Amino acid sequence: MKDYKNELKVKVDLGENLRGSIPGLIKKVMYKTQYLEIQVEKKNLLPVLRFLKESSKYQCTMLLDIVCIDCLNIEEIKIGRFKIIYVLNSIYNNTRVHISTYVENNGIIETTSGLFESSVWLEREIWDMFGIYFEKHPDLRRILTDYGFVGYPLKKDFPITGYLEVYYDVADKKIIYKPIELMQEYRNYNFGAVWGDYERKVYLENIIK
């Protein structure tokens, strides 16, 4: 059986020691069951990541993932629309550390490819899906969508239909891009209304009749 109290104590010790080791660079420390989250300002991201990787005490030498979250319409978050989380792993301490920061819409943040080679493709994916520009990235191109794609599909305000229709023209033997043409205006459907207890009963009774 896992000793969660001991795991949490290890994370608390790491967080407090880290706060004391690099004073002024850490904005907030949050202790989760599975990981330790350190929130920093965008300008302090690289110094904190470098310290965690190169310090013999922490040895966060693996960048497992970079996660981007669109915080559009979340009133509590006013420091930037997008939350970017760098997921680090320390085999030495047997723990994961999340370094998080916020970036504004269409914002710019410096690449971490100089510290972690694995971030090259991860940053390309975030650029492709969210439109966040990684400054000094060695090869910042789209990675999942095609080169003529318009917009960033994982942004919450991106339309479901997209902006362009793509198809292959057999006669001209080439790929055609043209603006989306909808046959009817967009509609909002209330799919959830019939699944309440009372509403569902009335709905079924009407069907039986």
Curated annotation (Swiss-Prot):
It is an enzyme of class 7 (translocase). The keyword Oxidoreductase applies. Signal peptide: none annotated. Keywords: Electron transport, Membrane, Mitochondrion, Mitochondrion inner membrane, NAD, Oxidoreductase, Respiratory chain, Translocase, Transport, Ubiquinone. It comes from Dictyostelium citrinum (Slime mold). Core subunit of the mitochondrial membrane respiratory chain NADH dehydrogenase (Complex I) that is believed to belong to the minimal assembly required for catalysis. Complex I functions in the transfer of electrons from NADH to the respiratory chain. The immediate electron acceptor for the enzyme is believed to be ubiquinone. Complex I is composed of about 30 different subunits. HAMAP family: NDH1_NuoC. This is NADH-ubiquinone oxidoreductase subunit 9. GO terms for cellular component: mitochondrial inner membrane. GO terms for molecular function: NADH dehydrogenase (ubiquinone) activity. It is found in: Mitochondrion inner membrane. It catalyses: a ubiquinone + NADH + 5 H(+)(in) = a ubiquinol + NAD(+) + 4 H(+)(out). Its EC number is 7.1.1.2. Belongs to the complex I 30 kDa subunit family.
